[in-house]
Amino acid sequence: MLIFAWLLTFSAPGAGLEAVSSAELCGDCHRAIHETWKASRHAHAMDSRLFQDVLHWTEADLGAAARRTCLGCHAPLALEIGDLTLQKKVSWEGVTCDYCHSVREVFMAAPNPKAKLKFDRMKTGPWKEADPGKHGAIFSDVHTSSQICAPCHEYRNALGFPVLTTFSEWKASRYAKEGRPCQSCHMPRVEHGGAARLVGATLLGAERHRQCEFCHAASAAGDVVEQRARRSSAAKSNLRDMVNLHEMKGSHSIEQLTSAIKAQLEAAREGNKLKVTVAVANVAAGHYVPTGSPLRQLVLEIRADTGGGKHFREERVYRRTVVDQQAKPVEREHIAFVKGVTAISDTRLAPDEKRSETFLFDVPPGDQTEIKAIFWYYYSPLATTESQKRVTFLTLSRLVQ
């Protein structure tokens, strides 16, 4: 009999559809934030093709009850309003504004972190001086810390297996000791105008956005709170100069991956062998790489192509290998969430970890060889398109005589 540990949030009694707000309402005033959020993985946590496929397989393999485990983090408001069949538009907004900004506390007690929610006109956030105008605001220490992320990025299943460990990976790293929460990398702060410029450059491309900004730069300062809302609250307080970006860039971002993983490629002759060495390091991720779903992988692929027509291929794979109660390797995410019992190996890169990978190829002297080291991030075996399955983010090359 399977037991599902899905209660990652709890709210005050009486939460219903009338108590929650759509992100579109928030976007009336918080335009730039809304635009960046709409392009984020949080906004598409529910409607992504990959998640839809996984949800289908979850119900087919594990029954309808398992659906709640998935929706708890991919459509949290659906659980709050009891819309398990996803009939309401707000249920399709993924991790939406009114979820995160209704969190009042996060309880870290075992087995899983839980968020306490309260849906009303008072919205929680990381700014003591916030005065949005249309609704009340409460400063929340939780929103300045990594704890706000923990209920969905730390999860132990009913069998005791730690399926998601991103929060605890961060907690054990120097980033936690230095007071650098998840937001410092995934929700960096910019000036008011900087948010508008980033939105424009993201949606239009940098060159087209510069053309727009030539005339519209004067209005950029009003990007975070829409001008009429800004004017209504200007007499009450001086609005802050900084705002957290809501793109929440992570492993689907080439920028984040290339920032986190650095590598050097060397090649030298050793008799009739060609020795290839790749130094690889996790230099900027405050958690393991990869993190999140236990089936994700970081793959280093080495290609050696000789002038004589020989082609060599080798790989190093950085991953967790999860097994079920029959010691059978788990090959689907939803099975890992429910039936995973242990990781029999873990070759991922810890924060600040450096490794040297060595490869030997049978290439005689004088046979010119092109060496390539290709890093790609593998997301899911259930992905139906190549872009959902993996992304190549770093390629190094060297020509050896």
Label every model-predicted segment.
Residues 1-9:
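Bacterial N-terminal signal peptides
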Residues 157, 189-401:
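Short, conserved sequence motifs used for protein processing/export or organelle targeting and
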Residues 8-177, 187, 198-200:
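Sequence context of c-type cytochrome heme-c attachment sites
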